Amino acid sequence: MGFPRILSKNNKIYTKLGEFCLSGDSFWIVCHTCQEELQTQDQFWKHIQDEHNFLHGVAKEHSRTSSYCLTDVEAAAATSGATTSQGAGSVTSVTVPLALYHCSTKYSEDDQREMDIHEAQQQQHQQQQQHQQQQQLQQQQQRDVAKELAELHANAVAVASAAAAAANESSTRSSSGIDIKIEPPCLTLPPEMQAAAAASNATIYHLPQLGPAAVPPPPPTTGFVSANVSTSTTVSTTPPNVTGSHSVMQQQAGVLTGSGLSTLSMSVGPSTAMAAALLSTQELPKDSNSTTASAGSAVSSDDGERWYICDYETCGLKFKYKSRMELHRVVHSKERRFNCELCSASFKQSCNLSTHRKKKHALRGIKSEILPQRF
């Protein structure tokens, strides 16, 4: 005799008194009353008869659509049970039909409701996870963009500082080419040079003096020294006492002021010219970008400028300053003079060390104590 069952969506077969659980090729039955697991149907029916006092189809049959529940059957069994006594012993026989729940669909509805709630919770959890992942991705993108902007700003600052340094250097170079006007008191030549000039019938002039004088004689015109890097040196002197005629002085003034040529105009003898050249070369102010090399180490070009030429094999590059040539020679010598004090890395140029400190150690600028002395 079969027993009623309901096939639910989660592959579980329910009876009205027990639950069939499927797992592959095997199954077992769970009692709804005490939750005991039974392996066969016979064990299940014997269990509910012995343990729970349920009889299977003893009095009459009921259809699967019976309208009363298990609680109604238990109440009827308590009120209308028939008791018979036989001999010494007594056997109680309760005629109770198999209870078929009128709320048999309750299990499937509850399971469906639980499944819906569980699925809704899972979907909500998945949505929360997706939302968190999107937020993390957006935050990571924002951090990347901020990092790129910071790097671009640092590069722009470095380029701006380099451009400012180049502008300052170019302004220094341009200012070094401006004529320097010096108005010192006059210097009288020694008696020996005056005697030599008188013997050679040369006109004696008073050369300018950079040192202070006690009482400078009032010259008729201001003497000046014009020193230009790109042109030849022009030394103009004004004699305090002129023995020649006024016409000779006018001719000499016309030669000095009228001619635009960059030549050396002097009206002194050979010994006086040598003394004037010596004083002018010794007393002129040095260029701020002048080199420490001797005059013989530089090569003068046709336009009057001095160039420092790299003498490494067949290089032959020309530089205006010796410091630039020394920096260039590092390329040939493979010397790394700029060292990082944090990681012991060495570089050929200071700009590479500055970039390394910014990117690797997040430091700005270069400490003066770690750089070699500038040329």
Curated annotation (Swiss-Prot):
Gene it is expressed from: ATbp
Keyword Hydrolase on entry: no
Leader sequence residues: none
Disulfide bonds: none
Function: May be a transcription factor for genes having (A+T) stretches in their promoter and/or enhancer regions. Binds to AT rich DNA.
Keywords assigned by UniProt, alphabetized: DNA-binding, Metal-binding, Nucleus, Repeat, Transcription, Transcription regulation, Zinc, Zinc-finger
Biased composition regions of type Low complexity, renumbered to the chain: 121-142
First and last residues of each zinc finger (C2H2-type): 29-52, 308-332, 338-361
InterPro entries cross-referenced by the UniProt entry: Zinc_finger, Znf_C2H2_sf, Znf_C2H2_type
Disordered: region residues: 110-142
Name of the protein in its database record: AT-rich binding protein
Gene Ontology CC entries for this record: nucleus
The keyword Transcription is assigned to this record: yes
GO biological process terms on file: regulation of transcription by RNA polymerase II
Alphabetized GO MF terms: DNA binding; zinc ion binding
